[in-house]
Regions:
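A conserved helix-loop-beta module that forms one wall/lid of the active-site cleft
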Residues: 1-48, 53
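ATP-dependent carboxylate activation and anion-phosphoryl transfer catalytic cores
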Residues: 12-13, 50, 58, 63-356
């Protein structure tokens, strides 16, 4: 429950962005909070996730149009999560998305450092890395302080992620708690050598943590690319079909998490994630190099994928510097670069698909 989580953060003196205090249930409520918060803002589903149930309002738009968008969110949330309540929150269009991995057993609370998840499309993460290139020791201490204090207040039991936004002035704002294992857990496991899946199961069985904070060290750098069945040339439109050929990468510092096999049908009704490819190295540069190699070795035929997108992304100046933010795709020319002839070959149909 995003609203209740933010209320608890405020009680703990953890900064949050301006937001409506309760769910918006009428046009009158909507007008009130639009007047108080002002654009840019986002309409957010109270129990949404994975980029579902969120709409950004940036420019000139009527209250009636906003209300129509809100009704669309309610319909979407009813079918996806069985809940229709939403709220309004100030929007940071050029932010860093940071998160802290927490492990708790109700009495003991440990952190496994931070991750960065700023590379997104439609509010859903595409690439994650640990640690964050944007976080120095002072900021790391603040992130961890906020996350641990929140976990203690909740008497948290399980693996969980406490998510934050960082603005251009280095101000932190609590966003939400994800009380489960995240898609991006492999990058944290790579730099800490802690098996989060195992600990989630052990805590769920009632076991107490047998490690302390001193046992958790970070070493190296890990970057994960989410390989999706979607076409970047068509604004990441889903691409259903049958997997006709599959070649997965390997080698030192490369990890692959996937369920794929040749002949498998990919349907348009579910999340488009096909595989997670992780590059690990002693430094960020080495992790990037290994991820580049791994992505070049990967072959997925039968559906369009975002592999060509990552081929361009990993050469971009902002990514290499670590300065990219949540609106990087929108403000950069990266999708225009995908239209170059070299990249377009990846989207050409096979000869068997061409009819006279």
């Amino acid at each position: 429950d995003k609203i209740e989580a933010k209320k608890m953060a405020q009680k703990l003196k953890i900064p949050t962005l301006p937001m409506s205090k309760e769910p918006i249930n009428s046009l009158k409520d909507l007008k009130k909070w639009i007047f108080l918060i002002r654009p840019p803002f986002v309409l957010k589903a109270r129990k949404g996730g994975g980029g579902i149930g969120i709409r950004a309002i940036n420019g000139e738009i009527t209250i009636g149009e906003i209300f129509t968008l809100a009704l669309g969110i309610r319909r979407q949330m009813s079918s996806a999560f069985g809940d229709t309540e939403f709220f309004l929150e100030k929007y940071l269009p050029d932010a860093k998305h940071l998160e802290v991995q927490i492990l708790g057993d109700g009495k003991n609370f440990l952190h496994l450092f931070e991750r960065e998840c700023s590379l997104q499309r439609r509010f859903q993460k595409l690439l994650e890395e640990a640690p964050s290139p944007s976080v120095d020791e002072k900021l790391r201490e603040k992130l961890i302080e906020y996350a641990i204090s929140f976990a203690k207040a909740l008497k948290y039991e399980s693996v969980g992620t406490f998510e934050f936004l960082l603005d251009q002035e280095k101000n932190l704002y609590f966003m939400e708690v994800n009380p489960r294992l995240q898609v991006e857990h492999p990058v944290t496991e790579a730099i800490t050598r802690i098996d989060l899946v195992e600990y989630q199961i052990r805590v769920a069985q009632g076991e107490k943590l047998k490690i302390s904070q001193n046992d958790i060290k970070k070493e190296g750098w890990a970057i994960e690319a989410r390989i999706n069945s979607e076409d970047p040339l068509q604004n990441f439109k889903p691409s259903p079909g049958k997997i006709e050929k599959l070649v997965l990468p390997g080698g030192q510092g490369v990890f692959v998490h996937t369920f794929l096999h040749e002949g498998q049908e990919i349907f348009p009704y579910f999340d488009p994630l096909l595989a997670k490819i992780i590059g690990y190295g002693k430094t960020r540069e080495e992790a990037i190099t290994r991820l580049k190699r791994a992505l070049k070795e990967t072959v997925i035929e039968g559906v369009a994928t975002n592999l060509p997108f990552f081929e361009i992304l990993l050469e971009e100046k902002e990514f290499l510097e670590g300065s990219y933010t949540t609106n990087f795709i929108e403000k950069s020319k990266i999708l225009e670069k995908l239209k170059a002839p070299k990249i377009c070959k990846a989207f050409l149909p096979k000869k068997s698909e061409i009819t006279e």
